C-alpha cells in the first residue's frame, strides 16, 4: 500500500509539472500570464486582505488555493474552437488572465484611494513586477504613513429640534475626538443618524442631508471635523425650512391588490368595503381574511409618530402569513394645518389557498427495494386567519430479503397519515395581546399515525404535538415543544422473532424497542446565526458562525403524579399508564459551527458538537429514537451511518447495539469552488458515541474520563458538491485514520496502514454537513 501511495504521489508530481509547462499555451507572444498578485502593508491596522477588493485584475483561480486546475483544463483544448470537445473544455475551464498595465495602474490608484479613505492621507502605493518567461508576478507595496486624527469635533445643525434630539443620543455616536479620520466611519455615522431620525417621525429624511467639513493644519496630521445637518429643501430651487416630523393619519387596507395593474388608487378593482375599529378595509368580492388578522399585524396606529422600523416589522408580519403572496405599504402626505400627516395604504395580494400534491418514490432499505406513494392536501387559510392546514396520506411496500425460515411471508407494508394545523400567532390562554404582538410566534398542532406490517411483527405508532416557533431579530430562532406524546404499540410479534432475538435477553436495547411504550416529553431549542457580509471599511467580512442548543425532558410530570397517587409499579419496577410504562430522561445538545472566508472561491469551516441523554427514575434506557449514533454523511465520514461506536465496541452487525447516550463530534473542512456549479472539499472528522452505563452486549462502550479521549475516531477525505442554487447535492468519500475498535497499531492507525476495502466509506447527502 505504501508503494501505491508513492506511485500516486509521483504521478501527481508529473501531472502538475506538465500542467505548469502548458500554463502559457494560449498567452500571446509579448504578453504575460498574470501568475500572482500580492499586497504588502507596513501598517498592522491595515490588513492586505482588506485591500484585495480594490485589485482590478486577479490571477486565474486556484483549487484549494494550490492548483490552477481550470486554467489547465482550458489549455487542454485545441486551437480549433469550432470543435465540440474544445468548446466544452473552454466552457468548463478558465481562460488565461493576460497581464494588463492599464488594470494594474487602476488597481494602484484604487488602493491609494482606499488608504486615504481610511485616514492615511499620505499613503503611497508602489507597484513592481517579476517576470519569468511568459509569467508575471505583481506586487503592491503600501506605505501607509501616519494616519490623520480628528482633533476637534463640532456639529452644525440648524434645526434646534433635531440638534436637541441628537444631543441626547450622542453616547451612541461613532465619531469621537482622537479617532482616525476614516471616511467609512463618517459614512456609517451618516447612516446611523438617518436611521435614528427615520425611526422618530422624519419620513422624508435621507443621509444626503448629512455632510462634513474637514480642516487640516498644514504640517500636522490633525483634522478639525464639523458635521453639518442641512435644512430641508424639496427641490434645488426651493427655499430651506426645518425638517418635519410626520404622524400617521388614516390606515386603509386593500386586500385584492394586483401587482400587475396600476398602483393608482382610483384604478384598483374594489367592489365593497367595511370598517373595523376605525380601519377602512376595501376588497373585491369577498374578504378572505378576518379584519382582526389585518389590524393585529400592524406595528403602528393612527396618531403614532412615523417609524420606519415599525413599517419594516409590519412588512415582516404580513410576510409570515401564508394566505398572502405580496405586501406593499404606501404613504401619501396629508398636511393638516401645521401638522404633517401620512395616510397609509396597506395593499395585499392573496396567495393560492388550496393545493393538492402527489409524490411517488422508490425506496432502498439495506438493499431491499420498494415503492412508496403519498398524496397531500393543504389549505393556507382555513379559518380566514391564515391558518395552514395539511393532511397527508402515505403508503409503502417493500420485499424483504434474507429472512430465515419460519415467517409467513416476506412483504413489508406501511400506511400512514399525518395532519397539522399552524396558527400565525401565539395561542395560549391568558396571554395578552401586547405579548402576542411582541412575540410573533407560530403555533403548531400535529397528529400522526403509522401502521407497519412486517413478517416479524405488527407495529402501530401514534403521536401528537403542540409547539411554538418564532424568530428574533432575524438571527435567532426559538422553538418550544410544549408537549409531545408518542405511543408505540405492538399487537403481534412472531414466535420465530421472539425466539431468535427477544427472548434471549442479551440485548437490553433490542428488548426495550420491541415493547409497548409511551413517551411524553417537552423541550426547547435555540438557534443563532450571525450575519455574514457585514461591511467594515468597505470590505466584506463574511466570517459567520452559528450556535445551536437543544434541551428535552420526558416523564417528569407523570413520575411526580405517579408517586403522589401512590401507583403500584409493574414487575419491572416501572410506573405504567394503562399498563404501558413511560420513558423518563433528560437530554441536552450544544453545537457550534464557524465559516471563515479566505477569498471569493475558498473558505474554511469548523464544527464541534456535544450531546448527552440520561435515563433515570422510571427508565433504565433511553428510547432508541432518542439515542445517538455516529458515522454517516453528517458525522465521522470514514464510517457508514450507525457503524461507529460506542467507545471501542467493534460492532456485531446489529445497528441497535451501535447507539449511545453521549456524543462528541468535531470537523474541519476546507471548501473550494471548482468550476461551473461544482465545489470541492477536503475534510477531517473526529468523534464517537458512548453509553452512560456498562452493558454486556456493548463491551468497551461505556464513557470513562480516563480513556474516552483514546476512543476518539478520526477520518479524512474528499468531497464533491453540486450547487443547484435551491439545494446542494453532496458526495463525500471518507477514509478511516484512527479506529478505536482495534488496539493493535496496524489496525488502530489505518492512516499508516490504509486498506481501501476496509477503511473507505461513501456518502450521498443534500446540503452541507454543518
Each language-model region and where it sits:
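Interaction-mediating elements
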Residues: 2, 22-320, 341, 435
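C-terminal motif of bacterial Sec signal peptides marking the signal peptidase cleavage site
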Residues: 17-20
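Transmembrane beta-strand segments of outer-membrane beta-barrel domains in Gram-negative
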Residues: 199, 338, 355, 408-609
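Outer-membrane beta-barrel pore domains and translocons
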Residues: 230, 254, 301, 332-334, ...
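Outer-membrane beta-barrel initiation region
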Residues: 239-242, 247-436, 513-520, 528-541, ...
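Extracellular loop and loop/strand-boundary signature of outer-membrane beta-barrel proteins
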Residues: 280, 362, 403-407, 507-513, ...
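Extracytoplasmic gating/loop element in the C-terminal half of outer-membrane beta-barrel translocons
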Residues: 342, 603-683, 687-697
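Outer-membrane beta-barrel "beta-signal"
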Residues: 722-726, 756-770
Amino acid at each position: 500500500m505504501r508503494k501505491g501511495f508513492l506511485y500516486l504521489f509521483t504521478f501527481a508530481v508529473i501531472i502538475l509539472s506538465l500542467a505548469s509547462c502548458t500554463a502559457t499555451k494560449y498567452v500571446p507572444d509579448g504578453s504575460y500570464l498574470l501568475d500572482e498578485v500580492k499586497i504588502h502593508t507596513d501598517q498592522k491596522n491595515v490588513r492586505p486582505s482588506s485591500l484585495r477588493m480594490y485589485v482590478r485584475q486577479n490571477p486565474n483561480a486556484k483549487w484549494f488555493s494550490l492548483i490552477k486546475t481550470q486554467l489547465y483544463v482550458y489549455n487542454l483544448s485545441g486551437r480549433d474552437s469550432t470543435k465540440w470537445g474544445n468548446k466544452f473544455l473552454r466552457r468548463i475551464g478558465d481562460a488565461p488572465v493576460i497581464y494588463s498595465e492599464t488594470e494594474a495602474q487602476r488597481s494602484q490608484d484604487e488602493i491609494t484611494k482606499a488608504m486615504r479613505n481610511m485616514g492615511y492621507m499620505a499613503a503611497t502605493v508602489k507597484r513592481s513586477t517579476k517576470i519569468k518567461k511568459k509569467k508575471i508576478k505583481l506586487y503592491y507595496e503600501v506605505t501607509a504613513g501616519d494616519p490623520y486624527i480628528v482633533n476637534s469635533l463640532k456639529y452644525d445643525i440648524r434645526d434646534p429640534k433635531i440638534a436637541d434630539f441628537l444631543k441626547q443620543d450622542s453616547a451612541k455616536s461613532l465619531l469621537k475626538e482622537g479617532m482616525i479620520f476614516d471616511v467609512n466611519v463618517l459614512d456609517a455615522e451618516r447612516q446611523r443618524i438617518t436611521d435614528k431620525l427615520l425611526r422618530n417621525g422624519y419620513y422624508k429624511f435621507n443621509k444626503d442631508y448629512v455632510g462634513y467639513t474637514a480642516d487640516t493644519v498644514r504640517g500636522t496630521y490633525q483634522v478639525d471635523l464639523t458635521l453639518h445637518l442641512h435644512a430641508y429643501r424639496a427641490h434645488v430651487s426651493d427655499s430651506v425650512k426645518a425638517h418635519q416630523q410626520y404622524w400617521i393619519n388614516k390606515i386603509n387596507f386593500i386586500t385584492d391588490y394586483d401587482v400587475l395593474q396600476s398602483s393608482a388608487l382610483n384604478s384598483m378593482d374594489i367592489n365593497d368595503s367595511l370598517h373595523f375599529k376605525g380601519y377602512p378595509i376595501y376588497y373585491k368580492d369577498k374578504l378572505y381574511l378576518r379584519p382582526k388578522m389585518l389590524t393585529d399585524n400592524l406595528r403602528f396606529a393612527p396618531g403614532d409618530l412615523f417609524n420606519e422600523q415599525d413599517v419594516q416589522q409590519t412588512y415582516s408580519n404580513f410576510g409570515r402569513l401564508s394566505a398572502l403572496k405580496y405586501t406593499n405599504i404606501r404613504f401619501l402626505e396629508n398636511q393638516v394645518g401645521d401638522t404633517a400627516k401620512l395616510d397609509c395604504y396597506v395593499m395585499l395580494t392573496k396567495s393560492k389557498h388550496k393545493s393538492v400534491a402527489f409524490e411517488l418514490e422508490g425506496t432502498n432499505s439495506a438493499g431491499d427495494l420498494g415503492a412508496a406513494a403519498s398524496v397531500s392536501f393543504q389549505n393556507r387559510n382555513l379559518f380566514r386567519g391564515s391558518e395552514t392546514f395539511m393532511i397527508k396520506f402515505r403508503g409503502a411496500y417493500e420485499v424483504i430479503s434474507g429472512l430465515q425460515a419460519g415467517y409467513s411471508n416476506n412483504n413489508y407494508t406501511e400506511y400512514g397519515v399525518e395532519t397539522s394545523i399552524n396558527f400565525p400567532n401565539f395561542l395560549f390562554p391568558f396571554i395578552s395581546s401586547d405579548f402576542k404582538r411582541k412575540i410573533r410566534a407560530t403555533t403548531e398542532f400535529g397528529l400522526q399515525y403509522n401502521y407497519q406490517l412486517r413478517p416479524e411483527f405488527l407495529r402501530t405508532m401514534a403521536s401528537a404535538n403542540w409547539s411554538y416557533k418564532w424568530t428574533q431579530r432575524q438571527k435567532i430562532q426559538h422553538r418550544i415543544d410544549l408537549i409531545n406524546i408518542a405511543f408505540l404499540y405492538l399487537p403481534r410479534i412472531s414466535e420465530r422473532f421472539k425466539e431468535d432475538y427477544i427472548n434471549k435477553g442479551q440485548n437490553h436495547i433490542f428488548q426495550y424497542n420491541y415493547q409497548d411504550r409511551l413517551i411524553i416529553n417537552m423541550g426547547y431549542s435555540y438557534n443563532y446565526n450571525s450575519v455574514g457580509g457585514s461591511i467594515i471599511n468597505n470590505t466584506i467580512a463574511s466570517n459567520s458562525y452559528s450556535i445551536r442548543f437543544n434541551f428535552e425532558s420526558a416523564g417528569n410530570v407523570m413520575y411526580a403524579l405517579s408517586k403522589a397517587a401512590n401507583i403500584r409499579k409493574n414487575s419491572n419496577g416501572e410506573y405504567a399508564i394503562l399498563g404501558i410504562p413511560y420513558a423518563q430522561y433528560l437530554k441536552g445538545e450544544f453545537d457550534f459551527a464557524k465559516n471563515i472566508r479566505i477569498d471569493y472561491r475558498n473558505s474554511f469551516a469548523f464544527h464541534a458538537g456535544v450531546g448527552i441523554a440520561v435515563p433515570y427514575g422510571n427508565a433504565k434506557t433511553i428510547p432508541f429514537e432518542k439515542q445517538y449514533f455516529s458515522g454517516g454523511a453528517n458525522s465521522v465520514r470514514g464510517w457508514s451511518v450507525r457503524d461507529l461506536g460506542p467507545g471501542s465496541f467493534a460492532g456485531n452487525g446489529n445497528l441497535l447495539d451501535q447507539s449511545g447516550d453521549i456524543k462528541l463530534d468535531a470537523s474541519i473542512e476546507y471548501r473550494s469552488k471548482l468550476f461551473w456549479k461544482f465545489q470541492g472539499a477536503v475534510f477531517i472528522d473526529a468523534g464517537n458515541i458512548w453509553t452512560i452505563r456498562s452493558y454486556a452486549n456493548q463491551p468497551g462502550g461505556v464513557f470513562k474520563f480516563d480513556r474516552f479521549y483514546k476512543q476518539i475516531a478520526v477520518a479524512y477525505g474528499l468531497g464533491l458538491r453540486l450547487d443547484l442554487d435551491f439545494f446542494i447535492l453532496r458526495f463525500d468519500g471518507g477514509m478511516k485514520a484512527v479506529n478505536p475498535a482495534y488496539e493493535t497499531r496496524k489496525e488502530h492507525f489505518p492512516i499508516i496502514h490504509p486498506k481501501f476495502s476496509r477503511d473507505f466509506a461513501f456518502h450521498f447527502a443534500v446540503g452541507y454537513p454543518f
